[in-house]
């Protein structure tokens, strides 16, 4: 079995099934927003032009990250129904492993929908900054293809079966990785067609429905996506409103149905000057990485998106991630401010502030917000 296997793209049936899933969901979302909601979009033309400029794979020189607040279980994919239905407008995102990948039908559906399986530390021992989903996202934001040289699935899991549905049944290429040693997922970064891709992330990591339209603190995974790709990705901050009315956490039966007739809005900020905003911190990251690699042979020659334990836990590295994460959060706050909302309390962005919630992880909170750990 060739451990350096890569390819231009997955098999034609796999691509067709994935495109059908993406287009089907996008069509439903677009229909719901246009026919059953009062939807408005700001900054759409500029963002659409950016996506159009990226349609030619050979012309892409860097990845694209979109980042937004998270206010309902329907944010993704519903918000993308606001965009024109063009075949290159397809994002990658993260999905909670303990929710999206618990059955074979769900696993296959979300895999076809370009969702990476992400373990949450509160629910799994396999969570954290070093998990395979983060590695895959970093590689998707870089120029590939990349062989599966991290968390490689065992040989028997490289082939499709009724119990192993997240690998390409029409290809013998061994490009599956595992998130926990028991599962297998096709590694999208092993394909040239996924070079310099678009990745969307909700850094809050939880649904947060606040009457004051504030955000929780951002988790540090977003920092790895900016610091570690080969080239600093383009970053577009976003702000969404009204989706919490479509699927509010206090809704009663039938909970699974989105509520029509609501007013929703999606605001795309301008593309960030990544070199100006993140160039200096990326330079500091590279210097730190070189210093650690020089003193610790185990940290040397690691593939893209894979870090040694020292680089994951080093105090200076942690502080860098905190700094980058706060920069990203401030970018989203700028878009929020453009919607006429008052500045939030700076303490809203600090982890310590949210520790005051105590052991309650979700539900109706003391500050009158609703939180769902999803």
PLM-predicted stretches and their roles:
Residues 1-19, 23, 27, 52, ...:
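Eukaryotic N-terminal targeting leaders
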Residues 7-8, 15, 105, 175-311:
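A cross-family acyltransferase "interaction/gating" segment
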Residues 263, 268-374:
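Fungal C-terminal region signature
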Residues 118-126, 164-176, 207-213, 315:
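Surface-exposed cleft-lining segments at the edges of enzyme active sites
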Residues 11, 56-132, 136, 144-165:
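Catalytic core of membrane glycerolipid acyltransferases/transacylases, capturing the structured
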